[in-house]
Amino acid sequence: MKKLIAIVLTLVLALSFAACAQPEAAPAETAAPETTESAAPAELVKVKVGASVTPHAEILNAVKDELKAAGYDLEVVEFTDYVLPNTALEQGDLDANYFQHTPYLENFNEKKGTHLVAVGKIHYEPFGIYAGKTSDLSAIPEGGSIAIPNDGTNEARALLLLEAQGLIKLKEDITFTATVLDIAENPKNLSIKEIEAAQLARSLQDVDAAVINGNYAIQAGLKVKDALAIEDKDSIAADTYANVLVVKEGHENDEATKALLAALQSDTAKKFMEEKYEGAVIAAF
C-alpha cells in the first residue's frame, strides 16, 4: 500500500512540474481594424435648377460632372414656358433657374412681385429673322406679316432687330421698352403679329417671316446661318440680353449658387456651346 501511495504521489508531482514548465500562452493578438482603400465619399448635396429645354438644360447637363466634383448632385427640371420657372423658384421649389435675360427678369419681378436676382451671365443667343412664306427680307410684300414674341422685353428686342433691317422705325429714344404701339414708321404697312415665343417657329408657314428667340430656333432645328438677319454680336443687345443664372433674393452667396455659377462659366461649358450650337449660342463670360 505504501508503495502504491508513493507511486501516486510521484506521478502527481511530475504532472505538477510539467504544468509549471509549460510556456505562458502568448497574449492574443488584437486584429487591426480593416482599412479601405479610400474614405467613403461624402454624400452629394442635391441642387435643383429649372431651365428651358434648349439650350439651357443641355448646357446644365454638360456640366454635371463639374458639379459632382464640387459635391453637388444636379437635377435639371425642364420647362417649356417663361413663367413657371420663375414662379417655381419664388415658391422655393427650385434652387435656381437658367433660361432668361436680365430685362425679362426685372420686368417679371416688377409685374409679379417676385424677389429673384441674377448672379452671373452665362450665354447670349442672337435673335434671328427666319423665313416663312418669303425667303428674302426685301421681297416681303406690301401688307406682309411678321411674327414676333408677345412678352415685353423680347417684343422690344424683336422690334429693334426689325428696325435695324429697315423694315420699321420706332419712336425717338424708344429701345428696350418698345411695343408695337411705338412703331413710328411702317413703310410696307406690315402686320406685326404678337405670338407666344414658344409658338413662333410653328407660325412660319402662316407669316412671311418671324423673329425667333435663339433657344426656340435651336429647338425647332433652325440654323443661325440660315436666318435672313441676326443681331450683331457686338450690339448692345448681345450684352443686355445675355442669359443669366437666377436665384431667390438672399441666396446669392450660397455655396451651391457659387458652385453652379462656376460650372456654368467653366471652360467645359464654353467648349460645349461652341461645338454644339455653331454660333447659335455664344458664351457671355
Specify the residue positions occupied by each region the protein language model found:
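Bacterial lipoprotein signal-peptidase II cleavage site
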Residues: 16-31
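Short, well-ordered beta-strand elements
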Residues: 42-54, 72-78, 145-146
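Short helix-initiation/N-cap motifs at beta->coil->alpha
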Residues: 76-87, 175-202
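Alpha-to-beta junction loops
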Residues: 90-100, 144, 167, 188-191, ...
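Ligand-binding "clamshell"
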Residues: 107-119, 134, 206, 211, ...
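A conserved helix-loop-strand patch within extracytoplasmic ligand-binding domains
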Residues: 119-168, 270
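A bilobed periplasmic-binding-protein/Venus flytrap-type ligand-binding module shared by bacterial periplasmic
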Residues: 126-137, 241-254
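Periplasmic-binding protein-like
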Residues: 154-163, 264-284
